[in-house]
Amino acid sequence: MSEQEIRKILEDNNQYLLLKHLDNLSEDKRSILIANLKKLDISSFFNIVKGTKDQKKFQYSEIKPAEVLENSKVDESLFRSYGEKALKNGEVAFFMVAGGQGSRLGFEHPKGMFPISPVCSKTLFQMHCEKIHASGKYYGFTPRLFIMTSSSNHDETVKFFNENGRDWLNLNDIYFFKQRDLPAIDMNGNLILIGETSLFTAPDGHGGALLALKENNMTSIMHKLGIKYLSYFQVDNPLVKLADPVFLGLHIFNNADISSKVLAKRDASEKVGVAAIADGKPCIIEYSDLPYELAIKKDDDGKLLFNYGSIAIHIFSVDFIDRITTDALHLPYHIAKKKIPYFSPDTGYLINPETPNGIKFEQFIFDSIPLANKTVFYETLRDDEFAPLKNKEGDDSIKTCKDGISLFYKNWFKRAEIKFDDFERATVEVSSLFAIEYEQFK
Protein backbone atom coordinates (compact mmCIF):
# COMPACT_ATOMS: atom_id res chain seq x y z
CA MET A 1 0.00 0.00 0.00
CA SER A 2 1.43 3.37 -1.03
CA GLU A 3 1.62 6.53 1.06
CA GLN A 4 -1.03 8.05 -1.18
CA GLU A 5 -3.40 5.17 -0.45
CA ILE A 6 -2.79 5.54 3.29
CA ARG A 7 -3.54 9.25 3.04
CA LYS A 8 -6.75 8.51 1.14
CA ILE A 9 -7.91 6.12 3.90
CA LEU A 10 -7.13 8.74 6.54
CA GLU A 11 -8.98 11.43 4.57
CA ASP A 12 -12.02 9.19 4.03
CA ASN A 13 -12.17 8.65 7.79
CA ASN A 14 -11.77 12.31 8.79
CA GLN A 15 -8.28 11.92 10.24
CA TYR A 16 -7.30 15.50 9.46
CA LEU A 17 -5.24 15.99 12.62
CA LEU A 18 -3.07 13.00 11.75
CA LEU A 19 -2.76 14.17 8.14
CA LYS A 20 -1.60 17.57 9.38
CA HIS A 21 0.92 15.87 11.66
CA LEU A 22 2.22 13.81 8.72
CA ASP A 23 2.74 16.97 6.68
CA ASN A 24 4.78 18.54 9.50
CA LEU A 25 7.18 15.60 9.85
CA SER A 26 10.54 15.25 8.16
CA GLU A 27 10.66 12.82 5.25
CA ASP A 28 12.38 10.12 7.34
CA LYS A 29 9.93 10.38 10.22
CA ARG A 30 6.96 10.50 7.86
CA SER A 31 8.16 7.25 6.25
CA ILE A 32 8.34 5.59 9.67
CA LEU A 33 4.81 6.66 10.61
CA ILE A 34 3.43 5.56 7.22
CA ALA A 35 5.12 2.17 7.66
CA ASN A 36 3.53 1.82 11.10
CA LEU A 37 0.11 2.68 9.69
CA LYS A 38 0.53 0.00 7.02
CA LYS A 39 1.42 -2.63 9.61
CA LEU A 40 -1.71 -1.84 11.62
CA ASP A 41 -4.07 -2.30 8.65
CA ILE A 42 -5.97 0.89 9.44
CA SER A 43 -8.53 0.28 6.70
CA SER A 44 -9.78 -2.79 8.58
CA PHE A 45 -9.61 -0.86 11.85
CA PHE A 46 -11.94 1.85 10.56
CA ASN A 47 -14.39 -0.86 9.52
CA ILE A 48 -14.33 -2.03 13.15
CA VAL A 49 -15.04 1.53 14.32
CA LYS A 50 -17.97 1.84 11.92
CA GLY A 51 -19.29 -1.57 12.97
CA THR A 52 -19.43 -0.62 16.65
CA LYS A 53 -21.32 2.56 15.79
CA ASP A 54 -23.92 0.52 13.92
CA GLN A 55 -24.46 -1.96 16.76
CA LYS A 56 -27.37 -1.56 19.11
CA LYS A 57 -26.29 -1.94 22.73
CA PHE A 58 -29.05 -4.42 23.52
CA GLN A 59 -30.42 -6.07 20.43
CA TYR A 60 -32.29 -9.15 21.65
CA SER A 61 -36.04 -9.56 21.20
CA GLU A 62 -36.31 -12.37 23.78
CA ILE A 63 -34.06 -13.15 26.72
CA LYS A 64 -34.31 -15.64 29.57
CA PRO A 65 -31.93 -17.28 32.06
CA ALA A 66 -29.75 -20.11 30.76
CA GLU A 67 -30.06 -23.65 32.06
CA VAL A 68 -27.20 -24.19 34.50
CA LEU A 69 -26.05 -27.56 35.83
CA GLU A 70 -25.93 -26.93 39.55
CA ASN A 71 -22.89 -28.17 41.41
CA SER A 72 -24.90 -30.08 44.01
CA LYS A 73 -27.07 -31.89 41.45
CA VAL A 74 -24.38 -33.30 39.15
CA ASP A 75 -23.45 -37.00 39.23
CA GLU A 76 -19.74 -36.37 39.64
CA SER A 77 -18.69 -40.03 39.45
CA LEU A 78 -20.16 -40.46 35.96
CA PHE A 79 -18.61 -37.36 34.45
CA ARG A 80 -15.31 -37.75 36.30
CA SER A 81 -14.66 -41.02 34.47
CA TYR A 82 -15.01 -39.31 31.08
CA GLY A 83 -12.72 -36.47 32.10
CA GLU A 84 -10.06 -38.69 33.64
CA LYS A 85 -9.93 -40.82 30.50
CA ALA A 86 -9.32 -37.75 28.31
CA LEU A 87 -6.60 -36.51 30.67
CA LYS A 88 -4.84 -39.88 30.79
CA ASN A 89 -4.97 -40.08 26.97
CA GLY A 90 -3.22 -36.69 26.67
CA GLU A 91 -6.22 -35.13 24.91
CA VAL A 92 -6.28 -31.99 27.07
CA ALA A 93 -4.07 -28.90 26.91
CA PHE A 94 -4.13 -25.68 28.91
CA PHE A 95 -4.60 -22.17 27.53
CA MET A 96 -3.56 -19.28 29.76
CA VAL A 97 -4.48 -15.74 28.71
CA ALA A 98 -1.67 -13.62 30.13
CA GLY A 99 -1.41 -10.42 28.10
CA GLY A 100 -1.97 -7.99 30.95
CA GLN A 101 0.46 -5.81 32.86
CA GLY A 102 0.30 -5.39 36.62
CA SER A 103 -0.06 -1.61 36.43
CA ARG A 104 -3.25 -1.50 38.51
CA LEU A 105 -1.37 -3.39 41.22
CA GLY A 106 1.48 -0.87 41.22
CA PHE A 107 3.60 -3.55 39.50
CA GLU A 108 5.16 -2.60 36.16
CA HIS A 109 5.71 -6.14 34.89
CA PRO A 110 3.52 -8.87 33.39
CA LYS A 111 0.70 -9.56 35.84
CA GLY A 112 1.59 -13.25 35.87
CA MET A 113 4.90 -12.37 37.56
CA PHE A 114 3.11 -10.88 40.58
CA PRO A 115 3.90 -12.77 43.83
CA ILE A 116 0.48 -13.67 45.22
CA SER A 117 0.50 -16.91 47.22
CA PRO A 118 -0.11 -15.91 50.85
CA VAL A 119 2.71 -17.84 52.54
CA CYS A 120 5.40 -18.61 49.95
CA SER A 121 4.84 -15.56 47.71
CA LYS A 122 4.71 -17.69 44.57
CA THR A 123 3.87 -15.82 41.39
CA LEU A 124 0.64 -16.36 39.50
CA PHE A 125 2.66 -18.07 36.77
CA GLN A 126 4.24 -20.48 39.25
CA MET A 127 0.94 -21.33 40.94
CA HIS A 128 -0.72 -22.21 37.63
CA CYS A 129 2.27 -24.13 36.29
CA GLU A 130 2.62 -26.20 39.45
CA LYS A 131 -1.05 -27.18 39.18
CA ILE A 132 -0.51 -28.22 35.57
CA HIS A 133 2.67 -30.13 36.43
CA ALA A 134 0.96 -31.93 39.30
CA SER A 135 -2.03 -32.81 37.11
CA GLY A 136 0.24 -34.35 34.49
CA LYS A 137 2.02 -36.40 37.13
CA TYR A 138 -1.23 -37.50 38.80
CA TYR A 139 -3.02 -38.54 35.60
CA GLY A 140 0.08 -39.70 33.72
CA PHE A 141 0.13 -37.37 30.71
CA THR A 142 2.52 -34.79 29.27
CA PRO A 143 1.03 -31.38 30.12
CA ARG A 144 1.07 -28.80 27.32
CA LEU A 145 0.56 -25.13 28.05
CA PHE A 146 -0.32 -22.44 25.49
CA ILE A 147 0.27 -18.89 26.71
CA MET A 148 -1.14 -15.83 24.95
CA THR A 149 0.84 -12.69 25.67
CA SER A 150 0.64 -9.17 24.29
CA SER A 151 3.19 -6.96 22.56
CA SER A 152 3.69 -5.06 25.83
CA ASN A 153 4.68 -8.07 27.92
CA HIS A 154 5.71 -10.86 25.54
CA ASP A 155 9.49 -10.56 25.78
CA GLU A 156 9.53 -10.20 29.57
CA THR A 157 7.14 -13.14 29.97
CA VAL A 158 9.25 -15.42 27.78
CA LYS A 159 12.42 -14.33 29.61
CA PHE A 160 10.79 -15.04 32.98
CA PHE A 161 9.85 -18.56 31.90
CA ASN A 162 13.28 -19.22 30.42
CA GLU A 163 14.83 -18.26 33.76
CA ASN A 164 12.29 -19.95 36.07
CA GLY A 165 9.88 -22.16 34.16
CA ARG A 166 12.04 -25.28 33.86
CA ASP A 167 11.44 -25.81 37.57
CA TRP A 168 7.71 -26.14 36.83
CA LEU A 169 7.27 -27.59 33.33
CA ASN A 170 9.29 -28.81 30.36
CA LEU A 171 9.90 -25.60 28.41
CA ASN A 172 9.51 -27.54 25.15
CA ASP A 173 5.88 -28.11 26.11
CA ILE A 174 5.10 -24.39 26.54
CA TYR A 175 3.95 -22.45 23.47
CA PHE A 176 3.98 -18.64 23.50
CA PHE A 177 2.19 -16.40 21.03
CA LYS A 178 1.00 -12.80 20.92
CA GLN A 179 -2.50 -11.52 20.44
CA ARG A 180 -3.29 -8.80 17.95
CA ASP A 181 -3.06 -5.09 18.75
CA LEU A 182 -5.53 -2.44 17.60
CA PRO A 183 -5.26 1.35 17.52
CA ALA A 184 -7.51 3.51 19.70
CA ILE A 185 -9.38 6.75 19.05
CA ASP A 186 -10.12 9.80 21.16
CA MET A 187 -13.65 10.92 21.98
CA ASN A 188 -13.79 12.83 18.69
CA GLY A 189 -12.80 9.82 16.61
CA ASN A 190 -9.17 10.79 16.02
CA LEU A 191 -6.44 8.15 16.04
CA ILE A 192 -4.25 8.52 19.14
CA LEU A 193 -0.49 8.96 18.84
CA ILE A 194 1.82 7.52 21.50
CA GLY A 195 4.92 9.06 19.95
CA GLU A 196 5.92 11.27 17.07
CA THR A 197 5.97 8.36 14.61
CA SER A 198 3.75 5.73 16.24
CA LEU A 199 0.12 5.16 17.16
CA PHE A 200 -1.11 4.00 20.53
CA THR A 201 -2.20 0.36 20.34
CA ALA A 202 -3.77 -2.08 22.79
CA PRO A 203 -4.63 -5.81 22.72
CA ASP A 204 -7.94 -6.65 21.03
CA GLY A 205 -9.47 -8.28 24.13
CA HIS A 206 -9.67 -11.90 25.23
CA GLY A 207 -12.05 -12.57 22.35
CA GLY A 208 -9.06 -12.21 20.05
CA ALA A 209 -7.64 -15.38 21.57
CA LEU A 210 -9.39 -17.81 19.23
CA LEU A 211 -8.25 -16.14 16.03
CA ALA A 212 -4.77 -15.69 17.51
CA LEU A 213 -4.59 -19.45 18.10
CA LYS A 214 -5.39 -20.06 14.46
CA GLU A 215 -3.17 -17.33 13.00
CA ASN A 216 -0.18 -18.52 15.04
CA ASN A 217 -0.69 -22.16 13.96
CA MET A 218 -1.41 -23.27 17.52
CA THR A 219 -4.41 -25.38 16.53
CA SER A 220 -2.24 -27.21 13.99
CA ILE A 221 0.22 -28.03 16.78
CA MET A 222 -2.66 -29.27 18.93
CA HIS A 223 -3.88 -31.62 16.21
CA LYS A 224 -0.37 -33.05 15.75
CA LEU A 225 -0.16 -33.67 19.50
CA GLY A 226 -3.58 -35.34 19.62
CA ILE A 227 -5.11 -32.56 21.71
CA LYS A 228 -8.91 -32.43 21.47
CA TYR A 229 -9.86 -30.14 24.35
CA LEU A 230 -8.48 -26.81 25.50
CA SER A 231 -8.85 -25.68 29.12
CA TYR A 232 -9.05 -21.87 28.98
CA PHE A 233 -8.33 -19.61 31.96
CA GLN A 234 -7.04 -16.15 32.77
CA VAL A 235 -3.76 -15.64 34.58
CA ASP A 236 -5.21 -13.42 37.31
CA ASN A 237 -7.39 -16.09 38.97
CA PRO A 238 -5.07 -18.30 41.07
CA LEU A 239 -7.94 -20.46 42.35
CA VAL A 240 -8.98 -21.82 38.94
CA LYS A 241 -9.19 -25.61 39.09
CA LEU A 242 -7.12 -26.87 36.19
CA ALA A 243 -7.56 -30.39 34.83
CA ASP A 244 -10.99 -30.58 36.47
CA PRO A 245 -12.13 -34.08 35.43
CA VAL A 246 -15.81 -33.46 36.28
CA PHE A 247 -16.06 -30.26 34.23
CA LEU A 248 -14.13 -31.86 31.40
CA GLY A 249 -16.32 -34.97 31.56
CA LEU A 250 -19.49 -32.86 31.36
CA HIS A 251 -18.11 -31.22 28.23
CA ILE A 252 -17.25 -34.55 26.60
CA PHE A 253 -20.43 -36.38 27.67
CA ASN A 254 -22.59 -33.60 26.19
CA ASN A 255 -20.51 -33.40 23.00
CA ALA A 256 -20.21 -29.66 23.64
CA ASP A 257 -18.27 -27.13 21.58
CA ILE A 258 -17.86 -24.79 24.57
CA SER A 259 -18.44 -25.34 28.26
CA SER A 260 -18.32 -22.52 30.79
CA LYS A 261 -18.14 -22.37 34.57
CA VAL A 262 -20.45 -19.87 36.23
CA LEU A 263 -21.19 -18.93 39.83
CA ALA A 264 -23.96 -17.28 41.80
CA LYS A 265 -23.57 -13.51 41.76
CA ARG A 266 -22.87 -11.65 45.01
CA ASP A 267 -25.59 -9.17 44.11
CA ALA A 268 -27.20 -7.54 41.09
CA SER A 269 -24.39 -5.01 40.71
CA GLU A 270 -21.50 -7.50 40.49
CA LYS A 271 -19.59 -6.82 37.28
CA VAL A 272 -19.72 -10.22 35.62
CA GLY A 273 -21.49 -11.27 32.43
CA VAL A 274 -24.59 -13.40 32.98
CA ALA A 275 -25.53 -16.77 31.49
CA ALA A 276 -28.63 -16.38 29.33
CA ILE A 277 -30.63 -17.61 26.37
CA ALA A 278 -31.05 -14.75 23.91
CA ASP A 279 -33.25 -15.21 20.87
CA GLY A 280 -33.04 -18.96 21.41
CA LYS A 281 -29.25 -19.21 21.68
CA PRO A 282 -27.09 -19.68 24.79
CA CYS A 283 -24.83 -16.72 25.48
CA ILE A 284 -23.11 -14.60 28.08
CA ILE A 285 -24.45 -11.04 28.23
CA GLU A 286 -21.90 -8.53 29.49
CA TYR A 287 -23.02 -6.84 32.71
CA SER A 288 -22.96 -3.39 31.10
CA ASP A 289 -25.26 -4.60 28.30
CA LEU A 290 -27.92 -6.15 30.54
CA PRO A 291 -30.81 -3.72 31.11
CA TYR A 292 -31.08 -2.61 34.73
CA GLU A 293 -34.63 -3.89 35.13
CA LEU A 294 -33.47 -7.39 34.14
CA ALA A 295 -30.32 -7.22 36.27
CA ILE A 296 -32.35 -6.64 39.45
CA LYS A 297 -35.33 -8.86 38.60
CA LYS A 298 -35.93 -11.79 40.96
CA ASP A 299 -37.62 -15.16 40.54
CA ASP A 300 -40.39 -16.65 42.70
CA ASP A 301 -37.82 -17.86 45.25
CA GLY A 302 -36.39 -14.38 45.70
CA LYS A 303 -33.14 -15.13 43.85
CA LEU A 304 -31.87 -12.99 41.00
CA LEU A 305 -33.47 -14.18 37.77
CA PHE A 306 -30.12 -13.80 36.01
CA ASN A 307 -28.20 -15.24 38.91
CA TYR A 308 -25.20 -16.91 37.29
CA GLY A 309 -22.14 -14.96 36.23
CA SER A 310 -19.25 -15.98 33.98
CA ILE A 311 -15.77 -16.17 35.51
CA ALA A 312 -13.73 -16.80 32.33
CA ILE A 313 -13.18 -20.53 32.85
CA HIS A 314 -14.02 -22.45 29.69
CA ILE A 315 -13.35 -25.66 27.81
CA PHE A 316 -13.16 -25.43 24.03
CA SER A 317 -13.18 -28.33 21.61
CA VAL A 318 -10.26 -27.77 19.26
CA ASP A 319 -12.37 -28.79 16.25
CA PHE A 320 -14.82 -26.01 17.13
CA ILE A 321 -12.02 -23.41 17.18
CA ASP A 322 -10.91 -24.65 13.76
CA ARG A 323 -14.45 -24.51 12.41
CA ILE A 324 -15.21 -20.93 13.42
CA THR A 325 -11.79 -19.57 12.39
CA THR A 326 -11.52 -21.24 8.98
CA ASP A 327 -12.20 -18.01 7.10
CA ALA A 328 -12.33 -15.18 9.62
CA LEU A 329 -13.90 -14.95 13.03
CA HIS A 330 -16.36 -12.06 13.18
CA LEU A 331 -17.07 -11.60 16.86
CA PRO A 332 -18.59 -8.22 17.73
CA TYR A 333 -16.34 -5.49 19.08
CA HIS A 334 -17.16 -3.72 22.32
CA ILE A 335 -15.96 -0.24 23.20
CA ALA A 336 -14.18 0.60 26.44
CA LYS A 337 -13.65 4.22 27.47
CA LYS A 338 -10.22 4.48 29.09
CA LYS A 339 -7.52 6.89 30.20
CA ILE A 340 -5.05 6.64 27.32
CA PRO A 341 -1.65 8.41 27.31
CA TYR A 342 -1.14 10.42 24.14
CA PHE A 343 1.55 12.34 22.32
CA SER A 344 0.74 15.98 21.62
CA PRO A 345 2.31 17.22 18.35
CA ASP A 346 1.72 20.81 19.52
CA THR A 347 3.87 20.46 22.66
CA GLY A 348 6.03 17.48 21.80
CA TYR A 349 5.16 15.88 25.15
CA LEU A 350 3.50 12.64 26.22
CA ILE A 351 0.42 13.48 28.29
CA ASN A 352 -1.19 11.21 30.89
CA PRO A 353 -4.87 12.20 31.25
CA GLU A 354 -6.67 12.14 34.59
CA THR A 355 -10.03 11.15 33.12
CA PRO A 356 -11.06 8.80 30.28
CA ASN A 357 -10.11 10.41 27.00
CA GLY A 358 -10.20 7.59 24.50
CA ILE A 359 -11.87 4.43 23.25
CA LYS A 360 -10.37 0.96 22.97
CA PHE A 361 -11.98 -1.81 20.93
CA GLU A 362 -12.20 -5.30 22.40
CA GLN A 363 -13.70 -8.67 21.61
CA PHE A 364 -15.04 -10.97 24.33
CA ILE A 365 -14.29 -14.69 24.30
CA PHE A 366 -17.83 -15.57 25.36
CA ASP A 367 -19.27 -14.00 22.22
CA SER A 368 -18.24 -17.25 20.51
CA ILE A 369 -20.84 -19.17 22.54
CA PRO A 370 -23.79 -18.46 20.18
CA LEU A 371 -21.70 -20.02 17.38
CA ALA A 372 -21.56 -23.35 19.21
CA ASN A 373 -23.84 -26.26 18.39
CA LYS A 374 -23.85 -27.30 22.04
CA THR A 375 -22.95 -25.35 25.18
CA VAL A 376 -22.79 -26.41 28.82
CA PHE A 377 -23.00 -24.00 31.78
CA TYR A 378 -21.72 -25.60 34.98
CA GLU A 379 -21.95 -24.05 38.43
CA THR A 380 -18.86 -23.72 40.59
CA LEU A 381 -18.57 -22.16 44.04
CA ARG A 382 -16.93 -18.81 44.67
CA ASP A 383 -14.79 -19.99 47.58
CA ASP A 384 -13.59 -22.95 45.51
CA GLU A 385 -12.58 -21.27 42.30
CA PHE A 386 -12.74 -17.50 42.11
CA ALA A 387 -10.32 -15.08 43.75
CA PRO A 388 -9.37 -12.69 40.92
CA LEU A 389 -6.49 -10.26 41.22
CA LYS A 390 -7.52 -7.00 39.55
CA ASN A 391 -6.74 -4.09 41.87
CA LYS A 392 -4.20 -2.94 44.42
CA GLU A 393 -6.93 -2.24 46.99
CA GLY A 394 -10.68 -2.74 47.42
CA ASP A 395 -12.64 -5.45 45.61
CA ASP A 396 -10.64 -8.14 43.78
CA SER A 397 -7.47 -6.79 45.38
CA ILE A 398 -4.16 -8.22 46.51
CA LYS A 399 -5.61 -8.72 49.99
CA THR A 400 -8.89 -10.33 48.90
CA CYS A 401 -7.01 -12.63 46.51
CA LYS A 402 -4.57 -13.80 49.19
CA ASP A 403 -7.43 -14.22 51.66
CA GLY A 404 -9.33 -16.29 49.09
CA ILE A 405 -6.37 -18.62 48.55
CA SER A 406 -5.90 -19.06 52.30
CA LEU A 407 -9.62 -19.70 52.87
CA PHE A 408 -9.66 -22.34 50.13
CA TYR A 409 -6.92 -24.37 51.81
CA LYS A 410 -8.27 -23.76 55.33
CA ASN A 411 -11.48 -25.40 54.16
CA TRP A 412 -9.44 -28.51 53.33
CA PHE A 413 -8.10 -28.55 56.89
CA LYS A 414 -11.62 -28.14 58.28
CA ARG A 415 -13.00 -31.00 56.16
CA ALA A 416 -10.14 -33.20 57.35
CA GLU A 417 -10.85 -32.08 60.94
CA ILE A 418 -7.30 -30.80 61.33
CA LYS A 419 -6.98 -27.87 63.71
CA PHE A 420 -4.04 -25.97 65.15
CA ASP A 421 -3.49 -23.00 67.44
CA ASP A 422 -5.06 -19.75 66.26
CA PHE A 423 -6.58 -21.58 63.28
CA GLU A 424 -9.18 -18.95 62.40
CA ARG A 425 -6.62 -16.17 62.09
CA ALA A 426 -3.95 -18.31 60.43
CA THR A 427 -2.80 -17.85 56.84
CA VAL A 428 -2.67 -21.20 55.04
CA GLU A 429 -1.20 -22.41 51.77
CA VAL A 430 -0.82 -25.92 50.34
CA SER A 431 1.50 -26.60 47.43
CA SER A 432 -0.17 -28.08 44.34
CA LEU A 433 2.85 -30.37 44.13
CA PHE A 434 1.54 -31.95 47.34
CA ALA A 435 -2.16 -32.06 46.41
CA ILE A 436 -4.36 -30.68 43.64
CA GLU A 437 -7.61 -32.01 45.13
CA TYR A 438 -8.92 -32.49 48.63
CA GLU A 439 -9.01 -36.27 48.11
CA GLN A 440 -5.23 -36.25 47.70
CA PHE A 441 -4.75 -33.90 50.65
CA LYS A 442 -6.70 -35.92 53.19
Language model segments and positions:
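Catalytic core of tubulin tyrosine ligase-like
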Residues: G226-S231, L239-A243, L248-F423
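N-terminal glycine-rich phosphate-binding loop and ensuing alpha1 helix
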Residues: E3-Y175, P183, I192-L210, T219-S220, ...
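Generic recognition of flexible, low-complexity loop/linker segments
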Residues: I6-R7, S81-E84, N217-I221, F247, ...
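Conserved beta-loop-beta/alpha segment of the NTase-like Rossmann-fold superfamily
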Residues: R166, L171-L263, S269-E270
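Fold-independent oxyanion-binding glycine-rich loops
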Residues: G99, S150-S151, Q179-R180, E215-N216, ...
